């Protein structure tokens, strides 16, 4: 007999699951991006620069959306996911920009930016997932990744634009460097942080039609905000560590620039810092998903055991067989049904 789970009870898998369109799109989009760069360089046509920005900024985040579409279940439609990506991305960067407009430079700047941006994405995730059924940690992680991908795409487009515009004209090399770095890091940046928050938020509401407040949601929000702040401040942290570890006095920094002798050390520490933050984020997400998976299996096992306890082995005349446990016939309580 097939056991009905929460996911199969709410419509099951979508018919377009597991078709591998995400990696096909990633590969073909990358080829289009390369061809666009070659044509731009060969023709010196600056009208193609926006195409490079859009392809480079949206390719990886939109691939994340396709990855989610092939795995999401329940009442979530493809249109809802695409809307969450585009509308959520636009509203996310606008809301974050408004919250960050009054922030002043200081030691806590990056941390405050992390709290502001994760708050905006969290609120958007609540709006997007309000009517989603079933609410499970896995569903929340997938929807959170979609909202985070939309935010990442529009934010990356802004960074790429700023990198391209200089006093000397369009700096194509700086533009491409910015796009490559942000494209490679986007899955372990905004996508990962919002996926963690979504997994905890939806996991807390498991089996319920509405979201449920628990302290774990607040803890998750603080954790992803701190990870976000550490990620953004990694450049400053790695620079300070380079001075401390090499014993170089801070006075050696002229006009706020790092001495050339420390360039390699700073780069190494920067990459190591990003790797550490990424590993912590992935470990947190995997831990949350495994915790809720075990919890779901325990609940399902208890439900099966409770329902089975009301079954009475009967003989051919509707009378319990000899030796069978005598069980009073009565209506089981509502929580068993």
Regions found by a protein language model. Give the residues of each.
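Hydrophobic alpha-helical segments at protein termini of multi-pass membrane proteins
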Residues: 1-337
């Amino acid at each position: 007999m097939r056991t009905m789970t929460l996911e199969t009870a709410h419509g099951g898998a979508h018919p377009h699951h597991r078709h591998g369109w995400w990696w096909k799109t990633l590969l073909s989009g990358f080829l289009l991006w390369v061809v666009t760069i070659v044509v731009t360089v060969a023709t010196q046509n600056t009208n193609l620069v926006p195409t490079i920005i859009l392809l480079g900024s949206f390719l990886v985040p939109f691939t994340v959306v396709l990855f989610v579409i092939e795995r999401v279940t329940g009442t979530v439609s493809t249109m809802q996911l695409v809307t969450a990506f585009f509308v959520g991305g636009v509203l996310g960067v606008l809301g974050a920009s408004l919250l960050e407009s009054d922030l002043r430079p200081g030691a806590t700047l990056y941390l405050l930016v992390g709290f502001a941006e994760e708050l905006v994405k969290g609120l958007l995730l609540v709006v997007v997932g309000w009517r989603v059924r079933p609410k499970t940690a896995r569903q929340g992680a997938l929807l959170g990744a979609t909202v985070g991908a939309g935010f990442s795409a529009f934010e990356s487009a802004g960074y790429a634009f700023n990198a391209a515009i200089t006093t000397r004209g369009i700096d194509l090399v700086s533009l491409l460097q910015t796009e490559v770095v942000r494209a490679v890091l986007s899955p372990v940046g905004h996508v990962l942080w919002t996926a963690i928050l979504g997994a905890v938020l939806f996991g807390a509401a498991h089996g319920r039609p509405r979201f449920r407040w628990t302290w774990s949601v607040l803890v998750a929000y603080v954790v992803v905000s701190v990870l976000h702040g550490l990620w953004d401040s990694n450049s400053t942290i790695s620079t300070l560590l380079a001075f401390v570890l090499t014993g170089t006095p801070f006075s050696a920094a002229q006009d706020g620039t790092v001495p050339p002798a420390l360039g390699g050390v700073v780069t190494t520490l920067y990459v190591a810092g990003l790797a550490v933050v990424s590993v912590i984020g992935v470990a947190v997400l995997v831990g949350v998903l495994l915790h809720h998976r075990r919890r779901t299996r325990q609940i399902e096992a208890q439900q099966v055991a409770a329902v089975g306890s009301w079954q009475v082995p009967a003989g051919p005349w509707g009378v319990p067989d000899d030796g069978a446990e005598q069980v009073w016939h009565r209506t089981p309580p509502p929580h068993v049904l």
